[in-house]
Amino acid sequence: MRHTDRFVKKVVIERIGDQRVLAEEEDVVIKEERISLYLNGTKLMSMMSLPSDQDAHAVGFLMSEGVIEKIEDLKSVQISSDGSSVYVEALINHENITNLFKEKTLTSGCCVGVTGNLEGNVLRKFIATPMQISLERIWEGMEEFEMSSHLFHETGCVHKASLLLEDGSKITAEDIGRHNAIDKVMGKARLGRIDTEKAVLVVSGRLSMEMVVKAVMHNIPMIVSRAAATFLGIKTAQELGVTLVGFARGEKMNIYTHSGRVDLRACKRKRGVTLHAPNQSSSLLR
């Protein structure tokens, strides 16, 4: 049995082509589950996600929302025996937990991602980390990222997030929602007490505002995706000091904001790099 088998189910489908049924056959689909999150003995919410890394998902989500402000405030996290519930005990920011339910923003994640603290948590933050990464390392990271997405290649139905760490290692998570995947990979880093201030977040989905906000809440200075960036994603990244890189495919990429963190000097393949908004604000954001 493969480790991914517990996340999938086989169903019978009718495959259509040339305006007719070509065959009736088995297909493999993702099996999501409802995961209940309990905080300090009270049920906070239920989330639809893959039944994996539930503890990391809970911690990453609560820290992304500012409910848990630092990992030292986490007392314990436990997963129920059937994997359907996560129990977190922690010192919490009561104002942020109130805001989480007072005004929700339905994000661009097709109802999988809902957040209540998109803007308030990051008003006092700015990522000023003076790190640099070579184009070669970004391209290598993207190649590894694409090659290792086993569940996506099998089902076409998951998002993935990876953290490329300063020492060359990486942390990876997958889920049906791109917000969930980011929360999981961030939670893994926090539970492992891993420094992410010079890490690069690689994601499979578009670079929207809420993706940038999640990165800022975990002090991530750079986000890279093979997908596009949205206007608010670019604007938020520019204002908060995040380097945003989109359309990173093959030997090409678009750098939208704070390009100084990408080292172009030693690269022999930089012909495919487009700088949309170098270190200063550009007309794109006005």
Swiss-Prot record:
GO CC entries: cytoplasm
InterPro entries: Cytidine_deaminase-like, FdhD
Full protein name: Sulfur carrier protein FdhD
Domain of life, per lineage: Bacteria
GO BP term (any one): Mo-molybdopterin cofactor biosynthetic process
Catalytic residues (UniProt): C110 (cysteine persulfide intermediate)
PANTHER family on file: FORMATE DEHYDROGENASE, SULFUR CARRIER PROTEIN FDHD
Record family assignment: Belongs to the FdhD family.
Pfam family, one: FdhD-NarQ
Any one GO molecular function term: sulfur carrier activity
HAMAP family referenced in this protein's UniProt entry, alphabetically: FdhD
UniProt subcellular location: Cytoplasm
UniProt-annotated binding residues for Mo-bis(molybdopterin guanine dinucleotide): F247, A248, R249, G250, E251, K252
Keywords, ordered alphabetically: Cytoplasm, Molybdenum cofactor biosynthesis
Organism name: Wolinella succinogenes (strain ATCC 29543 / DSM 1740 / CCUG 13145 / JCM 31913 / LMG 7466 / NCTC 11488 / FDC 602W)
Function: Required for formate dehydrogenase (FDH) activity. Acts as a sulfur carrier protein that transfers sulfur from IscS to the molybdenum cofactor prior to its insertion into FDH.
